[in-house]
Structures are given as structure tokens and as C-alpha cells.
Regions:
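RNA/tRNA-interacting regions in translation and RNA-turnover enzymes
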Residues: 1-220
Length: 220
């Protein structure tokens, strides 16, 4: 999917943006309004920023590609690229047709809402009306972390969204400053990537074309 942020004023959705470079992203407010799983009015009239991920279900990608194949259009490569391209469309009607979804992950400035842990934040986001990924687990030790990784590595093919790993976070927010940050990322979170899927393909032919500058380019 594509990282996104949603801003609410008095409980009303008023700004949506992509993560961009971490400081400045694209304003995609109009397009995010087309995402049914993103609440437009919260259950509480608060000012809040919530970060998450906009994604396309694998079943939706298959459905869209079947339609595009019948219409003689190029197929969408994968759910991740399809979600990013769909969210950035200039025409929000096209975005709506792509049937995007959103998972909420992060409550910005949780102390303002008396939320003290990651698990409590996810529960709070659900009460506000957000779509929270049900596949999150509270682990008590490293053995449970390893068990969870192995479980979802074996289950990921059955999920209706593409995933290449798991994010592991310290649960207690008051430990974050103590644990600290590197120049680019926090030390209290780490992304574990599943082993890459390996497939075998047959190369039937190579066609050489000459580019504008005279460079010879091989095409499989």
C-alpha cells in the first residue's frame, strides 16, 4: 500500500495526504474521500491526526484486471503500485472505481487522548470509527514474537492484501524517548521482512531495440 495521513477538525475529515518524503506529501484529500473504509465523521468531535496505509485488496486487483483485459487495457502490475497510482489520480472518479481501502495504524500525539500504549491506541482508533487491521498481536517476550512471525509468514498467502513483513513495536509509549531514535528511524520499532517468494520463469525470446540515443536495449 501507500502510507497516508488523515486530519480531522472537530471530528470531521478535512485533509488527506501521502507520506511523501516524511516532511512533505501530496494533498489527496478529494481522493481519500472516495475510500469507504476511511471515516469522514468520527464518533467523537476531536481534532486528531491518524496515520495509516491505503491499499488495494488482492481480490479487487483481480477484478479490475479482468475488466481491463476485456477492455484491451494494460493490466495493473501489483496491489502496491495499483494503490499508489490510484490514490494519486487527478480524477477522483477513477480513484473511486479502484475501490481502495485503508488501515489506521498510528494515533499522532496519543498523550492528548490519554492513550498510553500501542494496543490501547489501536482500540481507541476502532472506537473512533477507523478500520484497524485485525491481525495485530500483543507479544510478551521474544519467543512469542518469533511465533507470530512464523504464523503470519505461513498465513500471508491467504490474506486479501499483499504483505512482505511485520512491524514490531514497543507497546508502552512512555519508553519511546528513553529508547530513542537514529537519524532516520525510531529504535523502538523494526520491520521484519519475510523471505522473498521464489518462482521459476521461462525466457522465450529477447528482442533488441535501439533507443533515442543509439543505445541497444534488450527486451524479454
Amino acid at each position: 500500500g501507500i502510507a497516508s495521513t488523515a486530519h480531522y477538525k472537530s471530528g470531521m475529515f478535512n485533509l488527506g495526504a501521502t507520506r511523501g518524503n516524511g516532511q512533505v506529501g501530496e494533498n489527496v484529500t478529494t481522493n481519500m474521500l472516495t475510500i469507504n473504509s476511511l471515516p469522514k465523521i468520527l464518533t467523537s468531535p476531536i481534532d486528531v491526526e491518524v496515520r495509516g496505509e491505503v491499499y488495494m485488496k488482492k481480490s479487487v486487483l483481480d477484478e479490475l484486471n479482468e475488466e481491463r483485459k476485456n477492455d484491451g487495457l494494460p493490466l495493473l502490475a501489483n496491489p502496491r503500485n495499483a494503490a499508489g497510482g490510484s490514490l494519486r489520480q487527478l480524477d477522483p472518479n477513477i480513484t473511486k472505481q479502484r475501490k481502495l481501502d485503508q488501515f489506521a495504524y498510528t494515533l499522532v500525539n496519543p498523550e492528548k487522548y490519554n492513550v498510553k500504549t500501542q494496543m490501547d491506541a489501536l482500540d481507541y482508533l476502532k472506537t473512533l470509527g477507523f478500520n484497524v487491521n485485525p491481525n495485530h498481536v500483543h507479544c510478551n517476550d521474544i519467543e512469542e514474537v518469533i511465533e507470530t512471525i512464523e504464523k503470519y509468514d505461513s498465513l500471508r498467502k491467504t490474506l486479501d492484501y499483499a504483505t512482505d513483513g511485520i512491524v514490531i513495536k514497543v507497546n508502552e509509549f512512555d519508553l519511546y524517548d528513553t529508547i530513542g531514535y537514529t537519524v532516520k528511524v525510531p529504535k523502538w520499532a523494526i520491520a521484519y521482512k519475510f523471505p522473498a517468494e521464489v518462482v521459476t520463469t521461462r525466457l522465450n525470446d529477447i528482442i533488441f531495440t535501439i533507443g533515442r540515443t543509439g543505445k541497444i536495449i534488450p527486451n524479454a
